[in-house]
From Swiss-Prot:
Coiled-coil region: none
Species for this entry: Bacillus subtilis (strain 168)
Subcellular location: Cell membrane
Residues that span the membrane, as ranges: 315-337
Record protein name field: Uncharacterized protein YdjG
Gene behind this protein: ydjG
Primary localisation category: membrane
Domain of life: Bacteria
Length: 341
């Protein structure tokens, strides 16, 4: 994607400011609303002949950024990403959630998160080895799904009552049928091959009411990755994400029974609508003991996900504390019951 925003004052490049929600010039300090920036200062095209592709030498990740960028840091592995061949394909998303957390705020939030690790090494908790923090828009498909559900079940309702000296149990048997229609809106599924699904799922939720019509200005100063999977390819994952919610709703419709034995369940889910969006993520590359650790932060909420290193000493001390506490509790119970140490 080729995008260039020139400052009306000094002609320098402008970037999206997550704190003010406007375009900001780092040279002269001018700020402009995205909608009010003069058109003659905007050069943006979705042309197959002009979009640039940057490919990381280390991990092979394919990144998209402004045309004037010649080198950057790979958000996936922290390595250098270089300009490669030109792209093909239409890369314009329908919606975007802009960054609301600045790079400085992201760094502060990450340092705070590091210090909360009860089982992480002290050297890691100091959070003084941040190699890079890169703002990146990750491609997602949003799905609006409709599920038609038919369920047949054998149910019982048991109640007891006294009759003279006897306690009687009465069991009623029912055949139950449920015909359910459910709608699920804006189910997100990440469309990046390089991003782990588990990592992206943990970054949720985003506030999807903040989705905005896509404008190229939101990408100024950030990296955007193209999608690797179509909505058709990701439809099975979208259905999988709502399966537990469907089961939970089915269960709620059988309240009041003592037992429920589902003997037949049919679920038909269709894709009512799907659209391509970009969601903000801060990728953090952190060096610790000659190893690089990659973390992701929700660029809207500040939620951090990733696997920090674990201190074996702290883990051993933690288990020793649990074992010691359990031993002491058992001895106290023994004393109260008349036993002794």
């Amino acid at each position: 994607m080729i995008i260039s925003y020139k400052c009306p004052n000094c002609g320098s490049d402008m970037a999206f400011d997550s704190e003010t929600g406007s375009l900001s010039c780092s040279s002269c300090g001018r700020q402009d609303n995205i909608e009010s920036l003069p058109k003659e200062n905007i050069a943006a095209r979705f042309s197959d002949d002009e979009a640039k592709e940057y490919q990381c030498k280390n991990c092979g990740a394919v990144l998209i950024t402004e045309a004037e960028t010649t080198a950057t840091t790979c958000s996936f592995c922290g390595g250098a990403a270089i300009l490669a061949d030109r792209l093909s394909g239409h890369l314009a998303p329908a919606k975007v959630i802009p960054f609301t957390i600045s790079k400085q705020e992201a760094e502060q939030a990450f340092r705070k998160w590091c210090k909360k690790g009860l089982l992480t090494p002290r050297g890691f908790m100091s959070a003084d080895r941040i190699k890079s923090i890169t703002g990146m828009y990750i491609p997602f498909w949003m799905f609006d799904l409709n599920s038609e559900v038919q369920v047949r079940a054998n149910c019982t309702r048991v109640h007891q009552y006294e009759e003279g000296d006897y306690i009687c149990t009465e069991t009623e048997h029912f055949e139950a049928f449920r015909d359910i229609n459910l709608d699920y809106l804006k189910i997100p599924v990440d469309a990046s091959e390089k991003m782990k699904d588990e990592l992206m799922d943990k970054l949720e939720p985003y506030s999807y009411e903040e989705l905005k019509d896509f404008q190229t200005a939101y990408l100024a100063g950030y990296i955007a990755e193209k999608y690797n999977y179509t909505d058709e390819e990701l439809f099975p994952r979208a259905k999988e994400k709502i399966s537990s919610y469907i089961d939970s709703y089915i269960h709620s419709t059988f309240s009041g029974y003592t037992s429920v034995n589902v003997r037949d369940k049919h679920i038909h889910t269709k894709n009512v609508n799907s659209f391509y969006v970009l969601l903000p993520v801060w990728m953090v590359s952190y060096d610790y003991e000659r190893a690089e650790h990659i973390f992701a932060m929700n660029g809207q909420t500040g939620k951090v996900v990733g696997k920090p290193p674990i201190s074996r000493g702290k883990v051993a001390a933690w288990f020793s504390g649990i074992a010691g506490g359990t031993f002491l509790a058992l001895k106290l119970v023994s004393l109260m019951m008349g036993g002794g140490f």
